[in-house]
């Protein structure tokens, strides 16, 4: 059963910049709560960069108390080392909400684009424009935060339709 107000954390995984966006769903109304980026030092040791992402994302969850989380699935890069590092950042994006007992959903980039813009191959500018239309009070300054809000919007749209949500992978039981 969905809480009266469902607060959703969207995450755009990245090793240097992990975007996050929070929306609230009340009935059919979707409202902007907050957004931002958790940064890690691009020159630091990998373990410390991952720790920075973990601490930053945990702080977002503590501050905004979302009920559920959703993450953009990452694509495979041509550079195996970059792919591995991004995968480790993605692991942080998955485990931090799970440690807070949030259910975590994952969505492909094309599904996010299609849900937000109607076009699964939309450009970043089109996604940003639709996020601003759907969440007029949003002030996401970075592309990473905009992408995270698009993830949260996608989860909210699919959350309204439980049959569609069941066809997507939900990880964890949540609160």
From Swiss-Prot:
SUPFAM superfamilies the UniProt entry points to: Ribonuclease H-like
Top-rank lineage group of the source organism: Bacteria
The protein's name in its UniProt record: Crossover junction endodeoxyribonuclease RuvC
Function, as annotated: The RuvA-RuvB-RuvC complex processes Holliday junction (HJ) DNA during genetic recombination and DNA repair. Endonuclease that resolves HJ intermediates. Cleaves cruciform DNA by making single-stranded nicks across the HJ at symmetrical positions within the homologous arms, yielding a 5'-phosphate and a 3'-hydroxyl group; requires a central core of homology in the junction. The consensus cleavage sequence is 5'-(A/T)TT(C/G)-3'. Cleavage occurs on the 3'-side of the TT dinucleotide at the point of strand exchange.
Subcellular location field: Cytoplasm
E.C. no: 3.1.21.10
Cofactor note: Binds 2 Mg(2+) ion per subunit.
Subunit field text: Homodimer which binds Holliday junction (HJ) DNA. The HJ becomes 2-fold symmetrical on binding to RuvC with unstacked arms; it has a different conformation from HJ DNA in complex with RuvA. In the full resolvosome a probable DNA-RuvA(4)-RuvB(12)-RuvC(2) complex forms which resolves the HJ.
One GO process term, biological-process aspect: DNA recombination
Binding site for Mg(2+) 1: 12, 144
HAMAP family: RuvC
Reactions this protein catalyses: Endonucleolytic cleavage at a junction such as a reciprocal single-stranded crossover between two homologous DNA duplexes (Holliday junction)
CDD domains xrefs: RuvC
Active-site residues, Swiss-Prot/TrEMBL: 12, 72, 144
Metal-binding in keyword set: yes
Keywords: Cytoplasm, DNA damage, DNA recombination, DNA repair, DNA-binding, Endonuclease, Hydrolase, Magnesium, Metal-binding, Nuclease
Family under the similarity heading: Belongs to the RuvC family.
Main location: cytoplasm
Pfam families in the cross-refs: RuvC
List of residues binding Mg(2+) 2: 72
The UniProt record lists the keyword DNA-binding: yes
GO molecular-function term, one example from the UniProt record: magnesium ion binding
